[in-house]
Every structure is written in C-alpha cells, then in structure tokens.
Amino acid sequence: MSKIFRYECRRLLLSKFFFGLAAVTCFYGWQVLEHVTILGIAHTASFSPWSFGDYLSRLLPLLWLGTLFSVSVYTNGAERRAAMLTQAAPMHPAVYRLARFLCVLTASALLSLAAVFTAVCFYARMFRWHDWGTLVLPALVTLAPALLFAAGGGWLIGYMRVWLLVPWALFPFLSAALPLPEALGLWNGKLFSTRPLLLPSLDPAFSLSPETIVMQCALALAGAGLFFWAALKK
C-alpha cells in the first residue's frame, strides 16, 4: 500500500493545478490578513487564536474547493474506467481506494499548511510575534473536521455522479451566509467574533463550548463514515 500511496501522491501533488491552488491560497490568505485580520476580532489582538481562527474560517471555502479538486482526480470518468484494471490486480481494490483517499487528505493538509504558513509569516513580519503553539488548536478544530467531511462526502457523491461535486463545492459558501447556531459557528466564523465577548477576561484563551466540540467530532466521524460507505458500495 505504501508504494501505491507514494505513486498517487506524486501524481496528485506534482500537478500544475495543485501548485496553482497553493499559490492562490497563499495570495488570498495574505489579502485577508492584510485587510481583515490585522484589525483584530472581537477586541482581541490580530495574532490571537480568535483572530487566527476567523482567518482560517474565511479561507475554508477555498480549502474545501481544493479538497474537492483532489477528489475529482480520482472520481472522473477516466479514473473510473482505469479502476477496472485495478480490480483485476492481485491487491484488493479497497487498498487502492484507501491509498487514494489518504492522498486526498494529504493534499488537503498541505493546502491547509500553506494557509497557516502564510499567517505565520505575516505575524512574524508585522508584529515580530512567534508564539505559534497557540495557533495549533484553532487550526485543528477549524479545518480538520470540515475538510475530512468535504473529502468523505465528495468521495461518495463523486463516485455516484462526478458533476455532483459542483453543488457540494457550494456548501461552505452557503454555510457562511446562513445564521447558524453557536454549535456550527466555526462554519461562518461567527464563533470567533462573538464568543470572546462572552468570556470574563479581556484577552481570553481559546476555548469552545461542549456543543461545538461535539459537532466538530460528529463532522469528522461523518466524513470518515461517508468514505467507508462509498468504499463498501464499490
């Protein structure tokens, strides 16, 4: 499986389109940092975990699109026809599907790291701030569940009909426009601008409500479940 994974990663990550996505992510991220994040969020510093989380929530739709691009590489018509060859190979087809799904997650993680690295460079340049450890938790809880959900759902519907990835790509944009409850506030970024005002201290540490934690865990599990459902159907 490791050989399949390395081969598929090279095929996906060394494509011109992936490098283009990474460049667009860094450029758009810098614009958000320079024009929005620098103002601070909910009376917190521009480099606070709350402001950083708001920055990531604004980049989430773009990272979602990047994840679905990776999914489309393995669910388009040509790949599905080529799957007939892998089904005749001695290795179980589920191994190929799992290796490719891990490649999708790897690509999504690298795009997310590009967004995080852009913020790290911005904070170091503008504020001489280097306490990067405080950014790990908001990055994980904001991006990991959502992108796993994007990949799992995209894998399922992409194998059903690849064009269904287009409406699935609109999901984060729709979520950003809706008045969601606090448990889903990470999707539209409202949690980062409202929750600090509800906490007692002036510069509160990053924290989430139990409802939000449960919802993010449910999204991550749903993403994994959707992939395995699609794998079993094949």
Question: Residues of each region from the PLM?
Answer:
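Short helix-to-coil transition segments within interhelical loops
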Residues: 85-94
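Secretory targeting signals
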Residues: 23, 27-73, 98-168
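Terminal transmembrane helical anchor/hairpin motif
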Residues: 34-50, 168-234
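Transmembrane alpha-helical segments in integral membrane proteins
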Residues: 65-83, 154-162, 218-234
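Aromatic- and glycine-rich beta-strand/loop motifs that create alpha-glucan
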Residues: 1-24
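N-terminal hydrophobic signal/anchor transmembrane helix of membrane proteins
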Residues: 82, 104, 108-117, 212-226
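Interfacial transmembrane-helix starts/ends
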Residues: 5, 9, 13, 93-105
